[in-house]
Design a protein with these regions (language model features):
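Conserved small-residue-rich beta-alpha loop and adjacent elements
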Residues: 104-170
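Active-site-proximal helix-loop elements at catalytic-domain edges
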Residues: 1-14, 166-180
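N-terminal Rossmann-like NAD(P)+-binding subdomain of aldehyde/semialdehyde dehydrogenases
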Residues: 1-120
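Alpha-helix termination/capping residues and helix-transition junctions
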Residues: 116, 146, 174, 196-199
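Short acidic/polar active-site loop segments enriched in Thr and Asp
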Residues: 42, 150, 178
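Flexible, glycine/proline-enriched loop segments at strand-loop-helix junctions
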Residues: 35, 127-131, 153-159, 176-183, ...
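Conserved NAD(P)+-binding/catalytic subdomain of aldehyde/semialdehyde dehydrogenases
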Residues: 176-230
Length: 230
């Protein structure tokens, strides 16, 4: 049921605009249970959790390369043009950050310089559902590609039909990322941190999410997987 408010008192604004959230202890217990299930039952846990939480049954979490390539045919041409403009702008910005680092001799025979090296394996969490954030994939995927990251793995929640939004797959195609997995929520973060039969274990996880995803990233950090932020 939708409620409509008309000229609410200023004292009530904080309560009205407060996002729903679980008590911290309860949230930790829920996420810890998810981690225990993924650790114990591997991909089977992911299937059970996806059915329970996302309302769809997934047998093969990895999106096929042909499905990724076909996605552009389902997207409005004007949206594709806009995405390519955004891609070019983001690419030019991050590419400008690659500069040769000067070596400084701080004392005879002692030279110092700054060196940047790519992370080998990263996981990108891309929110999906009713509002797929393909912009997040552009802003995370482009710098990862420029940096020379060898293995980029995308996890994103499927819809009720067990599918990923075409626009996310289209962005993955222009980024030339083939490892896209139909899995979201706290369980996807656990899968990236622990590794499963299907989803590779990564060195660092990037990307925003809800309170369950954020708490799961905290667990990932305690498991030895680097994260971008909480």
């Amino acid at each position: 049921m939708i409620s409509y408010l008309k000229n609410p008192e200023i004292q009530s604004w904080e309560k009205i605009f407060c996002r729903p959230k679980l008590e911290e202890k309860k949230l930790s217990q829920i996420v810890e249970k998810i981690w225990d299930e993924v650790r114990l039952k591997n991909d089977n846990a992911l299937r059970e959790l996806t059915k329970k939480l996302d309302g769809c049954e997934i047998q093969d979490f990895k999106v096929s390369e042909s499905r990724i390539e076909q996605s552009k045919n389902n997207i409005d041409i004007e949206l594709r043009k806009s995405i390519l403009v955004a891609y070019d702008n983001i690419f030019r910005f991050h590419n400008s950050q690659i500069k040769p680092h000067a070596k400084i001799e701080i004392s005879p025979g002692v030279k110092c310089w700054r060196e940047s090296r790519p992370i080998n394996n990263v996981g990108l969490y891309i929110p999906g559902g009713s509002a797929p954030l393909f912009s997040t994939l552009l802003m995370l995927g482009i710098p990862a590609k420029i940096a020379g990251v060898k293995n980029i793995n995308i996890v994103t929640p499927p819809n009720r039909d067990g599918e990923i939004d075409d626009v996310i797959l289209y962005v993955a195609s222009i980024l030339k990322i083939s490892n896209v997995f139909k899995i979201g929520g706290a369980q996807s973060i656990a899968a990236l941190s622990l590794g499963t039969n299907t989803i590779p274990k990564v060195d660092k996880i990037f990307g925003p999410g809800n309170q369950y995803v954020t708490k799961s990233k905290f667990f990932a950090s305690n498991n030895g997987t680097d994260i971008d932020m909480l």
